[in-house]
């Protein structure tokens, strides 16, 4: 660990020791990380990952902390905050003969990407507004809601391979399916993503975003510590099973404590 700290200091990469992870996840629980590293840009992120590998230090890439449950014991190793990396990078728009594209860093909050698209009159990301987490996390699991998925608008992904190579891949090469991507089977570090969007009516885009956000407010405990939607939706069914269809109806109601009020019974896995 001392070797890693020395390398981080020499490279000017910020870190904290014994940082409570409860401050960095939406469940608001979790013990301390030995090191909590805050790279400011892609170069520092790549350096941090390489330093961890060289020192044989276990590491974990953390975005917005909205899809993780940390143990009370914390994390023995280095937690790398990729949301800090996004602060040193901006969103960009470019065009070619095939259409319009927005490039975003992995650590950017997904909601910020959606608002940026709205500001510039681009449609296609309305479904993602209100999904917690970062661009990188959403790409990693092919996040989706209300009939849309990341793969629907994703053009390409930049990532660091396990052996330290920087790779740009088209989305079609990354095995996207329902809540799955090739990144779940490899040790790659997502650096950024490019989205192919269409021009639309800003008023209609904003109205749809507000409509979906209101649905979230009505159905989900957004004001409580939560990991968001916990369960995958089975094909042709719902993740939430009404108590009267559950063989363990009594157990479900005991877990809830208040019949008819359990989020586990009302929506797609909010607990």
Label the predicted regions:
Residues 2-135:
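Anion-binding (especially nucleotide phosphate/pyrophosphate-binding) glycine-rich loop
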Residues 3, 47, 112-116, 156, ...:
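Alpha-helical scaffold segments in soluble metabolic enzymes
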Residues 16-17, 23-25, 68, 160-271:
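Phosphate/pyrophosphate- and phosphate-bearing ligand-binding catalytic cores of soluble enzymes
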Residues 67-68, 114-117, 125-129, 142-149, ...:
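A generic local secondary-structure boundary/capping motif
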Residues 104, 142, 226-227:
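Thr-Gly-centered strand-to-loop micro-motif
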Residues 117, 135, 139-143, 158-161, ...:
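Short, well-ordered alpha-helical segments in soluble proteins
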